[in-house]
Amino acid sequence: MDFESSSAGPSTSYAEEPCTLSMLPQVSAVLSETSITESNVSCQLHPSRSAALNDNVRTLIYNRTDPHIQLDMRAFYNCMEYEEALQPNYHYFTGVQENITPFHREQAIDWIYDVAKEENCDGDVFLLAVSLIDRFMSVQNILKHDIQMIAGVALFIASKLKAPHPMTASKIAYYSDNSCPIDMILQWELLIVTTLQWETESPTAFSFFDFLASRIPQIHNMRGDFQTVVQKCQKMHKLATLFPSMQCAIGLYYVSNLPTQNKELAVKIKDLLANMFQLEVNLLDSYIPMVQRCMSTTPIYTSEDAEKTEPTPSAPASTQEPEAFQELKELKEEPLPTPPPEEPAFQKLVLLEPIPLSEQTPSTPLNDSGFSSDVSSPASSEKKRRRSTDWFEEDSTPPKIFKTL
């Protein structure tokens, strides 16, 4: 096989010439570490090339367009089908979680975002970590002090799957100021992957970005802005729990309509989104305010006790009775005329004594808390109040991206 013309092996422009025994006197001045053991000769690469291979600044390599994969609609449809099976539950804050709120989630997302940025991780690593966090919290109730551990372990797992240089457990412990011990990180890693049934690899917004960029090459120039927008949107759980294809469409639609972008290119991208995802692109306008909110420097959820606001105290009962009750009371106090006694036609037999009014069953049924059904119990009122707080977003089903076969 000719490796010089194939991408499967190294070419002569990057490989050193083979060292032989006859060349040792000439290369002894260049190579400082050369050992001869019988017929084996170990040579050291040139320092400049060795430094380029071991450079930790660039820890990612963008993939080139493969027309057999990224231009094939079957691969695109497979990603869309796969994302439906691994979508997180948007309502897990009210249906599963009892101790954490979107405020705690936003803090954890901000932390792993800073860690991924410090480690020069690809944007795909961070998106996969957020997906693992939301999927795990969709099925498992956790405590408040475990959210940082779960976020760090999710980034640890995602770096193993996506990063060329995976992060180690010691780095996660270091960035957490040793609040996440190494042994606990490994235990939580096993718990998360078993809870998710080892389905840790899921499509992200970048998976669909590559499909779109392969059809319009100018989209590659938007990768930096697209990565920033999609990563910032992960702070809001309503956007983060959308389908990755929907996140890609929202992010690319937002970036293409920035004032610095070409208007003709924005029209092409709009048509491409409509053709690829089979959706009305105008529906994406409803998500633009949420994206702008995520892009701002202010936190989305400003207080961790936003959902724990004290109930509004009711006004004290007035000691003065209403006029209607006073009139009714005056009517009751007036003596009523006594009718003349009548002879009973027959003697009434009293079989059962009437039940006292105080012991009768109330007209309204009682609930399990002992309160009347028209008055909520403290637990139920707390639950209703939590569902109507400021941090809970309006429940609206996002437009579904549907496929055409």
UniProtKB/Swiss-Prot annotation:
Single GO term (MF): cyclin-dependent protein serine/threonine kinase regulator activity
Spans traversing the lipid bilayer: none
SUPFAM superfamilies: Cyclin-like
Any one of the GO BP annotations: positive regulation of asymmetric protein localization involved in cell fate determination
Positions of the UniProt region annotated as Disordered: 301-405
Pfam families listed in its UniProt record: Cyclin_N (PF00134)
PROSITE patterns the UniProt entry points to: CYCLINS
Residues annotated as signal peptide: none
Residue stretches of biased makeup (Basic and acidic residues): 326-335
Domain Cyclin N-terminal positions: 76-200
Phenotypic effect of disruption: Arrested cell division in the G1 phase during larval development. RNAi-mediated knockdown results in an arrest at L2 stage which is associated with uncoordinated movements, a slightly shorter and stouter body morphology, growth arrest and premature death. In addition, during larval development, cell division is impaired in P blast cells and mesoblast M cells due to an arrest prior to S phase. Lack of cell division in somatic gonad precursors Z1 and Z4 which is associated with a failure to maintain germline proliferation resulting in an abnormal gonad development.
Keywords, sorted A to Z: Cell cycle, Cell division, Cyclin, Differentiation, Gonadal differentiation
SMART domains on file: CYCLIN
InterPro entries, per the entry: Cyclin, Cyclin-like_dom, Cyclin-like_sf, Cyclin_N, Cyclins_cyclin-box
Compositional bias annotation for Polar residues: 311-321, 358-380
Source taxon at top rank: Eukaryota
Cellular component aspect of the GO annotation: cyclin D1-CDK4 complex; cyclin-dependent protein kinase holoenzyme complex; cytoplasm; microtubule organizing center; nucleus
Subunit field text: Interacts with cdk-4; the interaction is likely involved in regulating cdk-4 activity.
Family: Belongs to the cyclin family. Cyclin D subfamily.
Function: In association with cdk-4, regulates the progression through the G1 phase of the cell cycle during postembryonic development. Regulates proliferation of the coelomocyte lineage and intestinal cells during late embryogenesis. In complex with cdk-4, involved in sex determination during gonadogenesis by regulating the asymmetric division of the somatic gonadal precursor cell (SGP).
Protein name, entry field: G1/S-specific cyclin-D
Species assigned in the record: Caenorhabditis elegans
Lineage: Eukaryota, Metazoa, Ecdysozoa, Nematoda, Chromadorea
Protein's gene: cyd-1
